[in-house]
C-alpha cells in the first residue's frame, strides 16, 4: 500500500478514513470522521497506579498546526464525557496537543498545549515528572 499525504501537517491519509469520507455524508451534513493520535496509559508501582492505571488522550501536530474545528468539537466532546466520569482526574488525565518542529525527536522543539517546553520537560512529561494543564479546561 502506498501512503498518501494531503494534510498541512504532513500526516498520512488513512485509507479507511478516506473511504468513509467518500461513502458517507460530509461534515456539513452532520458526519465527521477523526483519528486520535495517541492514548497513553501509565500503570504499576513505577507511576503510582494500580494495574489499571491512568491515561491521557493526545493529538500530534507538526509546527504550529492546530486542531481543526471538527477535531476541537469531537475531542472536546470526548474530554467532557470522560471528565464527567472521572471528575477528580484519578484515571483520565486529560487531552493534550503536542506540537513538534522536527521528526528527529532528539532535535525537535516541542509545545504542549501551545506552551513551549524544554527537551527535558518534554521527556519528563512522558514519565509524569512534568505535569501541565490539559488542553480543554
Regions found by a protein language model. Name each.
Residues 1-34, 129-137:
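Acidic-basic catalytic patches of nuclease active cores, encompassing PD-(D/E)XK
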Residues 13-20, 93-137:
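Domain-level recognition of nuclease-like catalytic cores that cleave nucleotide substrates
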Residues 30-35, 52-54, 92:
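A structure-centric signal for secondary-structure junctions around beta-strands
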Residues 38-40, 53-63:
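Conserved catalytic cores of phosphodiester-cleaving nucleases, focusing on short active-site segments
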Residues 44-53, 85-89:
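Short, solvent-exposed loop/turn segments that connect beta-strands within catalytic domains
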Amino acid at each position: 500500500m502506498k501512503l498518501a499525504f494531503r494534510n498541512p501537517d504532513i500526516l498520512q491519509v488513512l485509507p479507511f478514513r478516506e473511504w468513509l469520507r467518500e461513502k458517507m455524508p460530509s461534515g456539513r451534513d452532520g458526519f465527521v470522521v477523526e483519528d486520535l493520535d495517541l492514548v497513553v496509559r501509565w500503570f504499576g508501582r513505577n507511576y503510582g497506579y494500580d494495574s489499571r492505571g491512568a491515561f491521557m488522550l493526545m493529538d500530534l501536530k507538526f509546527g504550529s498546526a492546530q486542531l481543526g474545528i471538527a477535531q476541537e468539537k469531537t475531542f472536546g466532546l470526548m474530554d467532557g464525557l470522560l471528565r464527567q466520569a472521572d471528575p477528580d482526574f484519578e484515571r483520565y488525565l486529560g487531552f493534550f496537543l503536542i506540537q513538534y518542529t522536527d521528526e528527529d525527536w532528539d532535535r525537535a522543539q516541542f509545545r504542549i498545549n501551545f506552551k513551549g517546553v524544554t527537551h527535558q520537560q518534554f521527556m519528563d512529561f512522558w514519565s509524569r515528572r512534568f505535569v501541565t494543564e490539559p488542553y480543554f479546561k
